[in-house]
Amino acid sequence: MKTALLLIAHGSRQDEANADLLDIVAEMRKRGDYAIVEGAYLELSAPTIEEATGRCVSQGAAKVVLLPYFLSAGVHVRQDLTAIRQKLAKDNPSVEFSLAEPLGPHPLLLEIVVQRARQAT
């Protein structure tokens, strides 16, 4: 059974802002923890979540982990992505979809905050 990791960022009209997600996707592919790794944007950019899900399914994913590349569990995560997960499950009944927690709060995030603050001083 192949498990896909689908990283989801908000999306931006600026390519350089979207590049962060593409870099993470590339690094996750190199690690090899998941058979399939794709990236998608909630809005303003492509690929959409639906398009990236199609890529996962066409590569044989039986399970797709939707991982919000967001810092907090706001409206986009709790409402929008939850609704999208439900729609994807309905549209792809042979595939299991799970929605992971966003990046923060996580103990490692505190270390990044400290590091960034020190770099700025």
Residue ranges of predicted features:
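Active-site-proximal alpha-helix that buttresses catalytic centers in soluble enzyme cores
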Residues: M1-T121
